[in-house]
Amino acid sequence: MASLGADKKHKVTVVGSGNWGSTICKIVAENTKANPDLFEEAVHMWVFEEDVVIDKSSPYYDPAVGDAPQKLTGVINKYHENTKYLPGIKLPDNIIANPSLQDAVKDSTILVFNLPHQFIGNVCKQLRGHIMPFARGISCIKGVNVSDDGISLFSEWIGDGLGIYCGALSGANIASEIAAEKWSETTIAYDPPPMDNSRAPTPRSNSPANGNGIAPLTPVEMQHKDARGRTSKTKLTPVPAEYPPLDHQIFKQLFHRPYFHVRMVSDVAGVSLGGALKNIVALAAGFVDGRGWGDNAKAAIMRVGLLEMVNFGKEFFGQTVHTGTFTEESAGVADLITSCSGGRNFRCAKMAVAEGLSVEEIEKRELNGQLLQGTSTAKEVNSFLKARGLEKDYPLFTAVHGILEGRHSVDDIPSLVSDS
């Protein structure tokens, strides 16, 4: 595809190398190789360096090395496989595992973030002043941060922390299935900043940047809006015209594969909220399934849960959130279905009810020190709603928190959500 006269290519870096980070890097590297007119072929993947030992049963076992620890980056670059976090999956040979965060992002114009959310602040601190000022980001980090003070999107944490614009990727995306190239879909939310050269209008403003024979934008139209539709405090640097436009078309070319279908939207808040709130609903689905109430009850939970997800987005993000993001996209209803069918929030809640234990007890027993996202999100959302006197407007979210706290039982759910 033509790059509209651009004479420079985009360099891509993936920040993070867990199972999902490595999977996304595999996808991106396949597409940079397939689109040499748009992207530099080499994709750097930042790896938090650690020592690994290659097991004797591995095809990569070297008797000369034996059980001696090896650097994970060295293993990835030599064998083109992340033997620790994505074993058995061959990675493209144009992926370069890099233990230096600042070196990995050098000269990159597209940054893909895929790491645990608790590391965002530290990573942004290390990157500040070391990235291209006009770089653009995509956050693959599911969820949002909810406190009594408000709701913040991880994409905005990144964008504000680095002074760039950052979109979000989320959906019914189980990393191991995608890495094995089993067909799935995802949603990418990206609302191209109005000062960037774009081949299509930004859906919210309907005002494409000039450069395509369109009248120049006014200073007001040129202002970048945040996910709530307010003028952003972050002052963006436009992407230079010598690069291919960073818009829906190019991000689809970067992420879309025959086995990984991408739908583009502009609703960053809706996509981000879907990835967080569905975990609360998944707990409720696990509760009723553990009680043995069957598929009808679980379907009722998903209906009420989806309604509350939409209402929450509309109430706290206003005009920027679209109902269709929740009802039509992978980041909404599809991710909800997956999470309510076999996700770990669902499984742990189901086991807790079936065995007469608390979710916390199951969590400690089953997750090897990891924590459920649903329990923390339920607590944060309840505190947020309670501070605003809105608990009754979200009966399912409130019921889940009540069950986790021991104030309600699963048997109370039908009466608690009866008016939904």
Swiss-Prot record:
Signal peptide: none annotated. Substrate binds at residues 142, 344-345. GO terms for molecular function: glycerol-3-phosphate dehydrogenase (NAD+) activity; NAD binding. It catalyses: sn-glycerol 3-phosphate + NAD(+) = dihydroxyacetone phosphate + NADH + H(+). InterPro entries: 6-PGluconate_DH-like_C_sf, 6PGD_dom2, G3P_DH_NAD-dep, G3P_DH_NAD-dep_C, G3P_DH_NAD-dep_N, NAD(P)-bd_dom_sf. NAD(+) binds at residues 16-21, 48, 119, 175, 344, 373. It comes from the Eukaryota. Residues 199-210 have a biased composition (Polar residues). Pfam families: NAD_Gly3P_dh_C, NAD_Gly3P_dh_N. Residues 190-217 are annotated as: Disordered. GO terms for biological process: carbohydrate metabolic process; glycerol-3-phosphate catabolic process. Its EC number is 1.1.1.8. Keywords: NAD, Oxidoreductase. GO terms for cellular component: cytosol; nucleus. The active site is at 278 (proton acceptor). The keyword Zinc-finger does not apply. Belongs to the NAD-dependent glycerol-3-phosphate dehydrogenase family. This is Glycerol-3-phosphate dehydrogenase [NAD(+)]. It comes from Colletotrichum gloeosporioides (Anthracnose fungus). The lineage of its organism: Eukaryota, Fungi, Dikarya, Ascomycota, Pezizomycotina.
